[in-house]
Design a protein with these regions (language model features):
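Hydrophobic/aromatic beta-strand segments within beta-rich folds
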Residues: 42-47, 112
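Short, charged beta-turn/beta-strand-edge "cap" motif at the junction between a beta-strand
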Residues: 49-55
Length: 126
């Protein structure tokens, strides 16, 4: 499965991930989002999504490892992938039937969202 990770760019942006090459994704408080983090497996693909004023998918990453030993604070190590050729905006997502039932649209505050293959391709411009 693929996932989308939301981040406020003023806190940690895709540019920060590009600089760092890898990071640990943790500190997620929503129980559904934590469950999605715990379900991740090494090698799975991620879309990095900027919240706030940008509201757009900006790049990709890959799951390196998952430490779910603390159910209330699962930690996922991710490594940077590629920047999108252009950001894919929330308006584009909402206009696409691929996302009609997606938590990305239906649960706007969810910070870790499962994606299917077609959604991943749309969000990355593939």
């Amino acid at each position: 499965m693929d996932y989308l990770l939301k981040t406020e760019p003023s806190t940690y942006s895709f540019a920060d991930l590009q600089r760092d090459k890898a990071t640990v994704w943790d500190g997620v408080s929503n129980p559904v989002a934590r469950r999605n983090l715990r379900a991740m497996k090494p090698g799975e693909r991620l879309v990095i999504y900027h919240t706030g004023d940008e509201k757009s998918a900006v790049g990709t990453a890959t799951v390196v490892s998952v430490d779910a030993s603390d159910a209330k604070n699962p930690q996922v190590k991710i490594k940077v992938g590629e920047a999108n050729a252009r950001p894919v905006t929330l308006a584009e997502v909402k206009a696409n039937q691929l996302f009609a039932e997606s938590p990305l649209v239906r649960q706007g505050r969810l910070s870790v969202v499962p994606l299917n293959e077609a959604q991943f391709k749309f969000l990355t411009g593939e």
